[in-house]
């Protein structure tokens, strides 16, 4: 049996360092790499598994995905996965303030970044402001 590969619109396997998202409420995000045997693997920080890890792409077979970030060159792709492997080696646990999107953002930019967390905090701020406005108008 052959390996499962995440591919682009032209059915070409995604390059090393490409980030993909699995559209859902939480927008799980992971990074593509290749194992020693050529099999595509995902580098991710998983809430379910509580820490960063390398997983077989088969785990996400038939799960819809979108390409969220693309490395600018093969060398950039290599640096991205090197940063991701360093985080996997460190093993810091998943938290709401250090999630899969932060993991990918740090691999790409060296800084945290989570669209989901930003959305939740933004929504909470709006709810708080509306609540304060409603309370002050009484």
Tell me what each language-model feature is.
Residues 5-7, 59, 63, 72-75, ...:
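Amphipathic, alpha-helical segments enriched in basic
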Residues 48-50, 119-124:
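Charge-dense, low-complexity polyampholytic segments
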